[in-house]
Amino acid sequence: MAGAASALFLLDIKGRVLVWRDYRGDVTAAQAERFFTKLIETEGDSQSNDPVAYDNGVTYMFVQHSNIYLMIASRQNCNAASLLFFLHRVVDVFKHYFEELEEESLRDNFVVVYELLDEMMDFGYPQFTEARILSEFIKTDAYRMEVTQRPPMAVTNSVSWRSEGLKFKKNEVFLDVIESVNILVNSNGQIVRSDVVGALKMRTYLSGMPECKLGLNDRILLEAQGRAIKGKAIDLEDIKFHQCVRLARFENDRTISFIPPDGSFDLMTYRLSTQVKPLIWVEAHIERHSRSRVEMLVKARSQFKDRSYATSVEIELPVPTDAYNPDVRTSLGSAAYAPEKDALVWKIQYFYGNKEHTLKADFHLPSIAAEEATPERKAPIRVKFEIPKFIVSGIQVRYLKIIEKSGYQAHPWVRYITMAGEYELRLM
């Protein structure tokens, strides 16, 4: 069998991801950016009309329709002609459903789009591409989706992610709203990359076949419905749901309704691309007092509210590769020299909001280290931390209801955590 598609992307004319579906888990959303960069690089070349491109182990096949790019990324030795034909069939199906395949129609019907992509391709292999067949399963009416009546669950095994007959002495649900902050600051102190990747992670210990309903705060719900809101809206992108979520219900009233799997799973993932203020800012100054002695002064400042605090803070500060015998003093926490990393690691257990702490260090260098010595490394400052009870996006769980026919009482637990993702400051 020919190689399969890894993922399918729908991009706007500027290369921004509108919708993407990951089929095999061997590529990431970053493939869209690499594809569009490749597309721009070849613009004007004799091969610029080639619908197939290859870069760093990934083959890209694409077609353009109106202001939309439909692109398949594959890490396998795939049949490009077959997948290009499939993309044209996808265009035909979308036109059947939405009349015009435009950016607006995709945004207004993203739940329908995901349903169609799931029916048309399975694990990267094309399945149903006839609009008439798909219409038997998925119907639309004025941008609203209606899923036709299906056979009972026992016949279709539509709850394949959950076994029947589960029993627990204590019925509990744990929901963690976790956001990872990615920051890259250049040597001039400018933020060159900033985004937040979020996930609603669940652990369920529930008997029977429970029905769960999760409601998020109004700033997300109202924005999704295109209505006026008060205060700053939460503009989430690249939203992906676990297969247990009833997408039709979410499309109708923005309620996340589902029968959960047993154990741990990601209910929902998302991304926030608006620029985020660095939660912990670090400045470092290095001064050479002689050919054999270097002094380092570091200031770390928390830039979040007083009532919050960061825990397990770890600041990795690069030092000259030939440094030895450090003398370190900190206003808070402890620091240790890690020669295997050529770094000084500063650890702070609790770092409260709107506070500044300092580190001073003296390093000795070999006496032969003069101006002719090896140039200093330009490694970045790396920061790790966790901030409990704090979320950058402002997303909040309004309610989490668990209903099961036996009528037992379940205990839901919700917590919020913000942590450092790829958090680097190239200031040294």
From Swiss-Prot:
Instruction: Name any GO cellular component annotation.
Output: Golgi apparatus
Gene inactivation effect: Growth retardation phenotype.
Record keyword Cell membrane present:
no
One short Pfam name that applies is Clat_adaptor_s
What sequence ranges are listed for the domain MHD? 170-426
Q: Which SUPFAM superfamilies match?
A: Second domain of Mu2 adaptin subunit (ap50) of ap2 adaptor, SNARE-like
A single BP term in Gene Ontology: intracellular protein transport
Instruction: Provide the membrane topology annotation.
Output: Peripheral membrane protein
List localization entries.
Golgi apparatus; Cytoplasmic vesicle, Clathrin-coated vesicle membrane
- Keywords, alphabetical: Cytoplasmic vesicle, Golgi apparatus, Membrane, Protein transport, Transport
Entries under Gene3D superfamilies matching the protein: 3.30.450.60, Mu homology domain, subdomain B
Q: What does this protein do?
A: Subunit of clathrin-associated adaptor protein complex 1 that plays a role in protein sorting at the trans-Golgi network and early endosomes (TGN/EE). The AP complexes mediate the recruitment of clathrin to membranes and the recognition of sorting signals within the cytosolic tails of transmembrane cargo molecules. Functions redundantly with AP1M2 in multiple post-Golgi trafficking pathways leading from the TGN to the vacuole, the plasma membrane, and the cell-division plane.
Spell out the family assignment given in the record's similarity comment.
Answer: Belongs to the adaptor complexes medium subunit family.
| Known partners and oligomeric status | Adaptor protein complex 1 (AP-1) is a heterotetramer composed of two large adaptins (gamma-type subunit and beta-type subunit), a medium adaptin (mu-type subunit) and a small adaptin (sigma-type subunit).
Name of the protein in its database record: AP-1 complex subunit mu-1
Originating species: Arabidopsis thaliana (Mouse-ear cress)
Q: Which gene encodes it?
A: AP1M1
